[in-house]
Design a protein with these regions (language model features):
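Extracytoplasmic/periplasmic solute-binding protein
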Residues: 114-127, 132, 156-208, 253
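Extracytoplasmic/periplasmic substrate-recognition and gating elements
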Residues: 33, 60, 120-121, 144, ...
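Glycine-centered hinge/linker elements that transmit conformational signals in sensory
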Residues: 159-161, 202-236
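Short, solvent-exposed loop/beta-turn-alpha elements that line the ligand-binding surface or hinge
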Residues: 89-104, 191-218, 279-288, 342-345
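Hinge/lid segment of periplasmic solute-binding proteins
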Residues: 73-132, 182-183, 273-275
């Protein structure tokens, strides 16, 4: 009788939060019990460790066989260019990842041989998802006699009513930038139907295009108009995004447009709910800003086919329905879209967010963080949104500045 071969591989992940780490430890324990020939040596790292330190470890021969890799040109793109990651297309076909996840999720982990982001071979799969949606305080809406808005005009009407009744309509914290740029991106992408998403995809993935989009111009105009009408929480310019979230949690405004990373924080306030971003008129399936966490990849350190095959088995488990249930039990949003997932009964807010996620991905509606477009776009967005809301910049000037940032980046890539 021939003994089964054993495989050992090391794994790097960034799940340092206690509940996240417990979920991963349980997943590894279950997986290795089901595959007794496989041993996984887990190591938890910071986000920054997945960048230059990971590359140095892989080039020196001391790196992990499986690692979470940050998407984008400076990280995954650089590792692909240096042939430090293995393509996963054969495994994606074997395990059904291409049917389990929509293109809008998998594209984020694709790189072509010409270093085109968003196309070509698949180099990773993510386990957690995230999106920016509409949080609302039902008690405050009920007090004002307002139904949950489904469209952008309904949201604007609701905010006008709330303002008239002395209830701050929309929480915003602009001090550290992110919440402002995410609101602008949300107002832009809610004007884009998923059936017409290709130009935005091309823009974000560096294929080409322009920010000179009338829908972005309209979004910037809406944002400035809301400010002038007093819909934002007073003093928002001096409030950070986490402080803004805490103010909303404490009932200081009726609405907050922000991400699912606040689900755990808001869980204790039963008046807080999560909904789809109200869509613009004439849009059937609007995009919602979002993405995934870092992708699980197989590195050049997996020297044998057996190691790579076993690593792929593990990655398949990490993105499986079973793992999705572990994430949900821990209070996090899985990237998978299992309609029969086991959602904790004591967490209705998480259930609302997960149902929104499932519906969104059913029509391929997961949009983009606009700052992905160029290495400098995050700074450009933050600065221009602050100037826009200080009435020191017109919507047209904002659009022109974003487009200039993009055009300069494309020139640096020598792409038309």
């Amino acid at each position: 009788m021939v003994a089964a071969q054993s495989t050992t591989f090391s794994e790097w992940d960034i799940y340092s939060y206690p509940e996240q780490s417990k979920a991963v430890e349980k997943a590894i324990s279950t997986f290795t019990a089901e595959h007794p020939g496989i041993t996984i040596q887990r190591s938890v790292h910071s986000f920054e460790d997945t960048r230059i330190p990971l590359k140095l470890a892989l080039t020196s021969g001391d790196g992990p066989q499986v690692a979470q890799v940050n998407q984008g040109g400076g990280d995954m793109g650089a590792l692909v260019k240096d042939k430090l990651l293995y393509p996963l297309d054969d495994y994606a076909k074997q395990y059904g990842w291409t049917t389990r996840f929509p293109d809008s999720i998998l594209q984020r982990n694709r790189w072509s041989d010409k270093q085109d982001f968003g196309s070509g071979k698949l180099y990773g799969v993510a386990s957690l998802g995230e999106m920016i949606g509409l949080y609302y305080n039902k008690a405050l809406l009920d007090k004002a006699g307002i139904a949950v808005p489904q469209t952008l005009p309904e949201l604007e009407k609701a905010m006008a009513t709330l303002k008239a009744k002395g209830i701050p309509p929309l929480m915003l914290g602009l001090l550290d930038g992110n919440m402002g740029q995410q609101l602008l991106s949300t107002l832009w992408e809610t004007h884009i139907d998923s059936a017409n998403r290709k130009p935005l995809d091309a823009l974000i993935y560096g294929v080409g295009g322009t920010f000179n989009d009338p829908r972005l111009l309209k979004a910037a105009g809406i944002m400035q108009d809301w400010n002038q009408k007093g819909y934002f929480f007073p003093g928002f310019q001096g409030i950070g995004h986490d402080d803004a979230a805490t103010l909303f949690q404490n009932g200081q405004s009726a609405f907050l447009i922000s991400g699912t990373w606040y689900l755990g924080q808001f869980k204790q306030n039963k008046d807080i709910h999560f909904a789809t971003i109200p869509h613009a008129e004439g849009v059937n399936h609007a995009l919602m800003v979002g993405g995934t966490d870092l992708a699980y990849s197989i590195t050049n350190m997996a020297k044998t086919k057996e190691q790579r095959d076993d690593a792929a088995k593990f990655i398949d488990y990490i993105v499986s329905d079973s793992m999705a249930n572990l994430w949900l039990q821990a209070g996090f949003l899985p990237a998978g879209t299992n309609k029969n997932a086991a959602i904790p009964k004591d967490n209705p807010l998480l259930e609302e967010a997960y149902r929104t996620w499932v519906d969104l991905n059913a029509y391929d509606g997961l949009g983009h963080y606009v700052d992905w477009a160029t290495p400098t776009m995050n700074t450009t967005l933050n600065q221009n949104v602050q100037l826009l809301l200080a009435n020191r910049l017109t919507p047209a000037q904002l659009v022109a500045n974003l487009d200039s940032d993009y055009a300069n980046y494309m020139k640096s890539l020598k792409k038309p």
